Every structure is written in C-alpha cells, then in structure tokens.
From Swiss-Prot:
It is found in: Secreted. One of its GO terms (cellular component) is extracellular region. One of its GO terms (molecular function) is ion channel regulator activity. Residues 39-44 are annotated as: Stretch between loop I and loop II. Residues 45-62 are annotated as: Loop II. Expressed by the venom gland. This is Erabutoxin b. Residues 1-21 form the signal peptide. Residues 24-38 are annotated as: Loop I. It comes from Laticauda semifasciata (Black-banded sea krait). The record marks H27, S30, Y46, F53, G55 as: Moderately important residue for binding to acetylcholine receptor. The record marks Q28, W50, D52, I57, E59, K68 as: Very important residue for binding to acetylcholine receptor. Belongs to the three-finger toxin family. Short-chain subfamily. Type I alpha-neurotoxin sub-subfamily. Binds with high affinity to muscular nicotinic acetylcholine receptors (nAChRs) (tested on Torpedo marmorata, Kd=0.07 nM), and with low affinity to neuronal alpha-7/CHRNA7 nAChRs (tested on chimeric alpha-7/CHRNA7, Kd=22 uM) and inhibit acetylcholine from binding to the receptor, thereby impairing neuromuscular transmission. Produces peripheral paralysis by blocking neuromuscular transmission at the postsynaptic site.
C-alpha cells in the first residue's frame, strides 16, 4: 500500500511539471532573435511598441508591464508568443 501511494505521488509530481517556466522572445527591434527563460511565476510574454526620433521601437520580454499612454502593448500566455 505504501509503495502504491509513493508511486502515485511521484506520478502526480511528474505530470504536474512543478517548476515550469515560460520562454519568451527578448530581442529588441533590430537585434537578432533571442529568447529568455522567464522567472518562476511569470506566466506571460509581452510585445511593446512605440515611436520616437529613431523610428518604431519594439521591445519584447517576460511578464506584462504597465505602460505609459501612446505605447502599444500586447501580452500573451504561450511559448514564444510575443514575436
């Protein structure tokens, strides 16, 4: 009985995949495509876009930040969804 219970606990932990982390793109507008493994607890990715004297700037990363007016923000919750 103890063996069955222990086996059930191990299977549950493996199936739940405790400690799962999100992977997001984190490159800037003109940079080569790169990804980042997000910190535990960060379950979303963001794509932030604005314009200034340099032209259109795009920033990507983990989380879903608060932005100022005039900045376009898209947040998503799947792997590398912020391209």
């Amino acid at each position: 009985m103890k063996t069955l219970l222990l086996t059930l606990v191990v299977v549950t932990i493996v199936c739940l995949d405790l400690g799962y982390t999100r992977i997001c793109f984190n490159h800037q507008s003109s940079q080569p495509q790169t990804t980042k493994t997000c910190s535990p607890g960060e379950s979303s990715c963001y794509h932030k876009q604005w314009s200034d004297f340099r032209g259109t700037i795009i920033e990507r990363g983990c989380g879903c930040p608060t932005v100022k007016p005039g900045i376009k923000l898209s947040c998503c919750e799947s792997e590398v969804c912020n391209n």
